[in-house]
């Protein structure tokens, strides 16, 4: 059951009213007699492998290009793949993107590692909108309300603003559509008392109104002792065709998630050096406070107005609002003593994040001629105000030691030095005005030139609510004016194969993220600069039964913050990090019943110039590999239909070893995860699926939290689900 306090209910009231008005207005606008609609037939589809290259992606370009036409590594994980691969969360969807690894560790639950970069260097968008707090705001969300997930590798600041050196990811919600009446229901149950109930419906009301509502509830007892999770998502939208050329979509979303006694990690056996070791007896242990908690409430609202002025000119205006409230109450750090006979608990954190974003984006698309050459333009202006206040209370501890296997932990507020008080630390206000422009001109029938440019003016204002000193002034402000872009060419070797080359740039903060930045992190530094060269090819073959992509890239990020060798207490914007790699994707329908798909990436990432303070000494880490970045990541999916209505399949994921520290002295081992499923279709619209994940019950680190802890991945799970549509 969803528990909402009176205070939270008051905060939610605008959302409730918006949802009610959405459907009541739609109903009011409908005539009394609803016209007959064409019958919607839901059946199993077999699309060609080449279709993956014909999907359009607005994340990689605003020009309306297909994956094949875009001069970059672009991945589109659509609704069909989400269901076929048993993708339960937004983060699981990223396994379908070559090279990406993720972590949902509570301290950074939206962590994504892409092309050797992480944090603010990988932008995560929600319907094309960035909240500039991705490592926290992009916490995994249940996939039911999403239509697809898109990703573009490499610098892409020119599309969506500061960040995106390693790439950009876009989570796109289901919206009301004109494709007919459809209702979908799903129920599932699995290990650790995991349950899901979900429903969605798309309805035409009258001649010009279309409504959609999706609701999902997911709950489970976590595999770690004492952990319980309950999450709700609601997405509603109303599409209104005001005229044949003008339409408006109102879309709202509500998300609430509560995790009791979150799992923060497992201590590493000492001595810690070389490859890490996990005591299997502690795999399921939870050393957090007995009443530890994480809770978040998120609301989105978007108003999208689209106008087709002519066959050549289209306009689109998006007004958007986002607000989120997140609460943490946890003991977050655990370490074995020297003899591995006791675990010391420390680092108690009472934290609140209160964030709100408001903005408006006006865009245009124009298709025309430049002399005798076909040309396409897209551009616009985006203005937003992003405000966040954080309320941290941190008590280092330690809070005593416990037996690693048989223990109880005290309530959070019984710990010495902890109080139930939320005191603001600082408020960051980020005002952004951006102009952006893209063009694609076909120089010949085979050769096209693509360019993109973006200019941002970013005003950062930080108000300190606590003690003032030289490193923490009462107020400071900074202004940044990055200019970023992309220039690329594509050449069609044949109607089914092309090659491309591109150069792109990016900009992001030298350390941290601007929505939480402190004076010591930004000082008088400018944004870092990133640049990439990429060459690649996209092709289909065997009459569309097979398709593939290959890409080679080289990325350099300059002016990152590093420790000053002459003064270990300060930083200088002189560091540099680089990565170069290869990414491969492929899919092939071997027979009408058998299909294989996969991706593989190799990355060589390193610090080129990087200093780290070790006590009072400054040590160079130049040449070392960034933490939590594997050199190799691969995925393989195999699906076979042995008889009518039946389907079986398996998948394997490989991740090579990673380092836990920038000194590269501690690492985990590589790991392989195996999964399998069997499904049976009852009639044309109902599907029953049994699925297993991590079938070998591999103990592996999803994330390495320094040299004392590892955040372990989920053990073996099984689940059974039924989904129907009518």
Residue ranges and their predicted role:
Residues 306-320, 324-332, 492, 498-500, ...:
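Membrane-embedded beta-barrel scaffold of Gram-negative outer-membrane proteins
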Residues 241-243, 355, 373-378, 382-386, ...:
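Structural signature of Gram-negative outer-membrane beta-barrels, strongest in the C-terminal barrel
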Residues 218-222, 235-241, 245-308, 321-355, ...:
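Acidic/polar loop-and-plug regions of large Gram-negative outer-membrane beta-barrel proteins
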Residues 299-323, 346-464, 549:
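Face-selective signature of the C-terminal outer-membrane beta-barrel domain
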Residues 144-147, 153, 158-236, 242-246, ...:
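Outer-membrane beta-barrel translocator/receptor signature
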Residues 102, 113, 129-153, 176:
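Short acidic/polar hinge/loop motifs at secondary-structure boundaries
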Residues 18, 353, 377, 624-726:
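Conserved C-terminal beta-signal and adjacent last beta-strands/turns
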Residues 446, 545, 554-556, 573-662, ...:
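Gram-negative outer-membrane beta-barrel transporters
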């Amino acid at each position: 059951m969803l528990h909402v306090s009176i205070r939270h209910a008051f905060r939610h009231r605008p959302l409730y009213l918006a949802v009610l008005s959405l459907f009541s207005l739609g109903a009011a606008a409908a005539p009394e007699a609803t016209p007959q609609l064409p019958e919607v037939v839901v059946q199993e589809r077999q699309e060609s492998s080449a279709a993956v290259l014909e999907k359009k992606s607005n994340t990689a370009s605003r020009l309306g290009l297909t994956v094949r036409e875009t001069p970059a590594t672009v991945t589109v994980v659509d609704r069909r793949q989400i269901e076929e691969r048993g993708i339960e969360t937004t983060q699981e969807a990223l396994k379908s993107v070559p090279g990406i690894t993720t972590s949902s560790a509570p301290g950074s639950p939206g962590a994504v590692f892409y092309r050797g970069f992480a944090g603010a260097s990988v932008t995560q968008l929600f319907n094309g909108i960035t909240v500039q707090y991705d490592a926290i705001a992009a916490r995994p969300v249940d996939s039911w309300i999403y239509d697809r997930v898109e990703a573009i590798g490499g610098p892409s600041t020119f599309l969506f603003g500061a960040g995106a050196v390693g790439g950009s990811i876009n989570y796109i919600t289901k919206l009301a559509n004109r494709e007919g009446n459809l209702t979908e229901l799903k129920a599932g149950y699995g290990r650790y008392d995991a349950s899901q109930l979900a429903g969605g419906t798309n309805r035409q009301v009258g001649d010009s109104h279309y409504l959609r509502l999706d609701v999902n509830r997911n709950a489970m007892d976590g595999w770690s002792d004492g952990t319980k999770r309950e999450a709700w998502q609601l997405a509603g939208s109303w599409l209104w065709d005001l005229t044949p050329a003008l339409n408006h979509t109102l879309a709202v979303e509500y998300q609430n998630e509560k995790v009791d006694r979150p799992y923060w990690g497992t201590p590493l056996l000492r001595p810690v050096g070389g490859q890490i070791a996990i005591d299997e007896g502690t795999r399921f242990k939870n050393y957090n406070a007995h009443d530890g908690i994480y809770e978040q409430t998120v609301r989105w609202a978007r108003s999208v107005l689209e106008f087709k002025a002519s066959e050549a000119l289209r306009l689109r205006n998006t007004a958007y609002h986002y607000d989120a409230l997140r609460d943490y109450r946890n003991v977050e750090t655990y370490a074995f003593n020297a003899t591995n006979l006791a675990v010391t608990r420390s680092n108690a954190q009472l934290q609140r994040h209160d964030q709100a974003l408001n903005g408006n984006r006006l865009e245009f698309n124009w298709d025309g001629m430049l002399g005798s050459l076909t040309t396409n333009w897209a551009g616009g202006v985006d203005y937003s105000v992003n405000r966040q206040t954080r309320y941290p209370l941190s008590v280092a501890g330690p809070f005593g030691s416990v037996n690693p296997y048989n223990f109880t932990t005290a309530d959070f507020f019984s710990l010495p030095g902890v109080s139930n008080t939320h005191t603001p630390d600082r408020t960051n206000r980020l005002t952004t005005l951006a102009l952006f422009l893209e063009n694609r001109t076909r120089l010949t029938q085979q050769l096209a030139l693509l360019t993109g440019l973006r200019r941002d003016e970013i005003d950062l204002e930080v108000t300190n609510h606590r003690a003032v000193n030289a490193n923490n002034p009462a107020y400071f402000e900074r202004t940044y004016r990055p200019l970023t872009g992309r220039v690329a060419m594509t050449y069609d070797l044949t109607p089914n194969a092309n090659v491309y080359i591109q150069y792109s740039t990016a900009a992001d903060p030298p350390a941290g993220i601007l929505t939480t930045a402190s004076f010591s992190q930004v000082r008088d530094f400018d944004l870092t600069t990133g640049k990439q060269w990429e060459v690649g090819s996209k092709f289909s073959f065997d009459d569309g039964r097979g398709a593939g992509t290959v890409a080679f890239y080289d990325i350099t990020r300059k002016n990152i913050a590093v420790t000053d060798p002459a003064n270990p207490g300060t930083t200088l914007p002189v560091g540099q990090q680089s990565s170069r790699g290869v990414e491969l994707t492929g899919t092939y329908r071997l027979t009408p019943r058998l299909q294989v798909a996969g991706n593989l990436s190799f990355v060589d990432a390193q610090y080129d110039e990087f200093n780290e303070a070790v006590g009072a000494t400054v040590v160079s880490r130049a040449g070392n590999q960034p933490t939590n970045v594997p050199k190799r990541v691969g995925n393989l999916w195999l699906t076979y239909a042995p008889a009518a209505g039946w389907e079986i399949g398996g998948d394997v994921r490989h991740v090579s070893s990673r380092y836990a520290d920038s000194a590269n002295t501690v690492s985990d081992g590589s790991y392989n995860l195996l999964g399998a499923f069997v499904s049976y279709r009852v009639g044309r619209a109902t599907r029953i699926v049994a699925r297993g994940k991590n079938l070998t019950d591999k103990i592996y680190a999803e994330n390495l939290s320094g040299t004392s802890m590892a955040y372990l991945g989920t053990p073996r799970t099984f689940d059974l689900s039924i989904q129907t549509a009518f």
